[in-house]
Amino acid sequence: MTQWEVVIGLETHAQLSTVSKIFSGASTQFGAEPNTQACPVDLALPGVLPVLNRGAVERAIRFGLAIGATVAPRSIFARKNYFYPDLPKGYQISQYEIPVVQGGQITIQVPANEKAGKQAYSKTVNLTRAHLEEDAGKSLHEDFAGMTGIDLNRAGTPLLEIVTEPEMRSAAEAVAYAKALHGLVVWLGICDGNMQEGSFRCDANVSVRPVGQEKFGTRAEIKNLNSFRFLEDAINYEVRRQIELIEDGGEVVQETRLYDPDKRETRSMRSKEDAHDYRYFPDPDLMPLVIGADWIERVKGEMPELPAAMQQRFVEQYGVSAYDAGVLTSTKAMAAYFEAVVAKAGAANAKIAANWLMGDVSSQLNRDGIDIDACPVSAAQLALVLQRIADGTISNKIAKEIFVAIWDEKAADEGAADRIIDAKGLKQISDTGALEAIIDEVLAANAKSVEEFRAGKEKAFNALVGQAMKATKGKANPQQVNELLKKKLG
């Protein structure tokens, strides 16, 4: 039986976060009434000329530096010629032979797949290029009684098209790459990453070949995948389709396909024979883009600390695991919140801070469907909760209750934890004599568990600990309860 290898390359369109379009001064704001943000340049009216947006170029430079790519000192804009109703000029301004960003790489973390028996691993994906181009308008097919409406608000919006080498070997790797790239462009501030609004969308080139064969199989390109789930589902379906087709004696046709999320399948859009011959040629209205070394150095000096460097620093500075560091640097906001907590609670509490962010804080954020930026518990408030655990004022169980209380009341005061502790009498019982008296009562009321423990049943001891904690309403130190119980049980 033939063993198959999957070959995947991704082309990703990241909408650059400029205020105006790439070749005009029209706004890029999402959600405006149709055709209210299209100026004469976007509409291709006679006598207008494009003027390159410096901000778009700077964002491309920033991306190139972040991935260790070559930023071309001289690149060319080209006309990509094709006809479509939402493309007013009859061509798209893009880059072809000489892109602004060349090469580079992104390291991805592929999660474990227990069902398939695969462990987590890291992999470096090489990039071919990233080039600047303008977006097309939008064709609207609904609510027009069999006709198509054209909205040109999006026409001319700046895009950075990022192209990988065909090095990914599974849908899991493709999704891991897409997530890493998404996180990076958002971290750099060059793209807002809003997939629902089309700010970040992928085209997947998928083929299969027998294991060991060097020659690539015939590929299909799946267009405009705007969610990580769609990307994974589309690739998995396409891989199954191609393998079944070949094993049934058929041949894969090079074509463009669309993903149908309702049916969870891909369907043919156009074959190679119908594919466009774009007839690229240099745009005579735009001078070559020349980027000097001083410009690159200035952008480099303004770059934020990159996620990989921050992960390494968190491991070395705070003693957290590599995995934890990866989670904590998943977004710039999460990393900033963590460091703000540690700055207040002290470096000695860094590990417990990491545990709280990945546990209770993330759980509450998911429950309420919000990001860390909107967390109602400030870093200073959480830091005080952690300090009260560390100094023995409260137990971990009580700390969780206090955290939820601060969250639910959206307390504004930095000392909210202390206020709630005092108001509800939540201080941990530290008086050994008082705790011993409670434990004596627990032992007297649970004679059966005492007998079972002395007969060698360890579970009985845990039951006694639980009863003691219940009797103290969770205000006892669990470690102290353990020690006193062991002492009294001999």
UniProtKB/Swiss-Prot annotation:
Q: Which reaction does it catalyse?
A: L-glutamyl-tRNA(Gln) + L-glutamine + ATP + H2O = L-glutaminyl-tRNA(Gln) + L-glutamate + ADP + phosphate + H(+); L-aspartyl-tRNA(Asn) + L-glutamine + ATP + H2O = L-asparaginyl-tRNA(Asn) + L-glutamate + ADP + phosphate + 2 H(+)
Under Pfam families, the record lists:
GatB_N, GatB_Yqey
* Taxonomy, superkingdom: Bacteria
Which UniProt key words apply to this protein? ATP-binding, Ligase, Nucleotide-binding, Protein biosynthesis
* GO molecular function, a single term: asparaginyl-tRNA synthase (glutamine-hydrolyzing) activity
Asked if the Swiss-Prot or TrEMBL record annotates the protein with the keyword Hydrolase, the reply is no
| Any GO BP | glutaminyl-tRNAGln biosynthesis via transamidation
Recorded E.C. number(s)?
6.3.5.-
Instruction: Identify the SMART domains for this entry.
Output: GatB_Yqey
The record, for InterPro entries, names: Asn/Gln-tRNA_amidoTrfase_suB/E, Asn/Gln-tRNA_Trfase_suB/E_cat, Asn/Gln_amidotransferase, Asn/Gln_tRNA_amidoTrase-B-like, GatB, GatB_C_1, GatB_Yqey_C_2, Gln-tRNA_amidoTrfase_suB_CS
Q: What does this protein do?
A: Allows the formation of correctly charged Asn-tRNA(Asn) or Gln-tRNA(Gln) through the transamidation of misacylated Asp-tRNA(Asn) or Glu-tRNA(Gln) in organisms which lack either or both of asparaginyl-tRNA or glutaminyl-tRNA synthetases. The reaction takes place in the presence of glutamine and ATP through an activated phospho-Asp-tRNA(Asn) or phospho-Glu-tRNA(Gln).
Q: Which family does it belong to?
A: Belongs to the GatB/GatE family. GatB subfamily.
Q: How does it assemble?
A: Heterotrimer of A, B and C subunits.
What is this protein's name?
Answer: Aspartyl/glutamyl-tRNA(Asn/Gln) amidotransferase subunit B
- What organism, scientifically named, is this protein from? Burkholderia thailandensis (strain ATCC 700388 / DSM 13276 / CCUG 48851 / CIP 106301 / E264)
Gene that codes for this? gatB
